[in-house]
A protein has these predicted regions:
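Active-site C-terminal subdomain of aminotransferase-like
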Residues: 217-314, 320
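Glycine- and acidic
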Residues: 64-71, 93-97, 120, 145-148, ...
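N-terminal entrance/gating region of PLP-dependent enzymes' catalytic architecture
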Residues: 1-93, 346, 354-357
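Predominant activation on well-ordered alpha-helical scaffold segments within soluble catalytic domains
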Residues: 56, 81-85, 107-111, 135, ...
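Conserved PLP-enzyme active-site core in the AAT-like
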Residues: 101-254
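Short acidic-aromatic active-site loops that bind/stabilize oxyanions
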Residues: 69-77, 99, 103, 177-181, ...
């Protein structure tokens, strides 16, 4: 702790050395970041960061160890393994590793699916609302992504998926737990069953909705081959904090790396350290798992309240999701439309060829009652 205190003292000591112009630049950045603290912030998945998480970010910066040379950092390795075991327990997988985000995780999972497939097919199925990183990954890997239509709830239509699988057996099926657009959850059990019938890889992109696993609100996930989760979205953690979990072990790379004591695993990431997981570790260490669960429950409760307020007080079209995103469409554009979008209070998306408003409850500080009242301010 003395080293941490010394670092904090050093930071405090250099503050008076900043010129007025430098201080103004720093203040402008801090002021810009305050947008995430607002009880009206519901435009996007960026969260406010708790003090315990901020401490973990500072610890990672001070430590700065590179786990490609894991033998030098046994404490860091131990913390990483503790967290991975925690994730595996909640998501019913057997091993995994941290990544810089689910865009990287989705690419790696499809890489594994492609290279370990016993078929010649290159087709990957996912919903029409699948995250764009899946489409990018398929382009990079030479795979053929084919979108499956969604139902009126924004979920992948399981009948359409079944029909597609009968016509062309896929290499992989992507199931999303919390689409970025509407927060919808694809029919997981149907995806598992079809993947098993087709001997295809089933990957779950739970970047946004993975927090539901902590609430025991997801089905048996052990049938998935791989799962991505982004704590920097649903767990209110600092970026980057993402994890990619696998049901089966990964082999080592068949590449000579004479300067390393251990042969790297066949994963996308190279150099990394505590920046990917120490903030989350600090959060769990200092506030506990139950605090994280309460955070998820509180933000989902506010999303539910916001949906209820719209249904009880308007005749607007409104779409509720279990992951904390509420989409709605008033009869006419809101009076303060531009300000709502500019201030990050709401965002827009497309649903069934209509432009709709989107409220993302990423923070448990977002207050549904205040947010609803803001819609009618002139």
């Amino acid at each position: 702790m003395s080293l941490l205190a010394q670092q904090l003292a050093t930071l405090t000591a250099i503050l008076p050395e900043f010129s007025a112009e430098q201080q103004a630049q720093i203040e402008a950045l801090l002021s810009e970041a305050n947008i995430h603290q607002s009880p009206l912030w519901a435009g996007h998945m960026t969260t406010n960061i708790a003090p315990a998480t901020q401490l973990g970010t500072l610890l990672a910066t001070i430590h700065n160890g590179n786990l490609l040379s894991a033998e030098l950092y046994p404490q860091l390795v131990d913390i990483e393994q503790q967290l991975l075991q925690w994730f595996c327990q909640h998501f019913q997988q057997n091993q995994g590793h941290f990544t810089h985000g689910s865009s990287y995780g989705n690419l790696e999972a499809l890489w594994q699916a492609r290279d370990y497939s016993n078929t010649d097919t290159k087709i990957v199925y996912g919903s029409q609302d699948v995250h764009y990183s899946i489409i990018k990954a398929c382009q990079i890997l030479g795979l053929n992504f084919q979108a499956i239509a969604c139902n009126m709830q924004g979920e992948m239509d399981k009948v359409a998926l079944q029909k597609a699988c009968k016509q062309h057996v896929p290499l992989a099926i992507i199931a999303t737990v919390g689409t970025s657009s509407t927060g919808a959850i694809d029919p997981l059990n149907a995806c598992f069953e079809l993947a098993e019938q087709c001997h295809a890889w089933c990957h779950i992109d739970a970047a946004w909705g993975g927090g539901l696993a902590l609430l025991d609100q997801l089905p048996d996930l052990s049938r998935a081959h791989s799962i991505c989760v982004d704590p920097h979205k649903a767990f209110a953690q600092a970026r980057p904090c993402s994890v990619l979990l696998y049901q089966d072990d990964l082999p080592a790379l068949d590449i000579a790396t004479h300067y390393l004591s251990q042969t790297p695993k066949r994963v996308l990431a190279g150099s990394y350290g505590g920046e990917l997981f120490l903030p989350l570790w600090c959060s769990l260490l200092l506030t506990g798992e139950q605090a994280l669960i309460r955070h998820i429950q509180n933000r989902l409760a506010q999303a539910e309240l916001f949906y209820t307020l719209i249904k009880q007080n308007t005749n607007w079209w409104c779409l509720h999701s279990a992951t904390g995103i509420i989409c709605f469409r008033p009869e006419q554009v809101l009076f303060n439309h531009e300000q709502l979008l500019q201030d990050g209070i709401l965002s827009e998306t497309q649903f069934n060829d209509h432009t709709v408003y989107r409220a993302v409850f990423a923070n448990d500080t977002c207050q549904a009652t205040q947010l609803f009242a803001t819609l009618f301010k002139q």
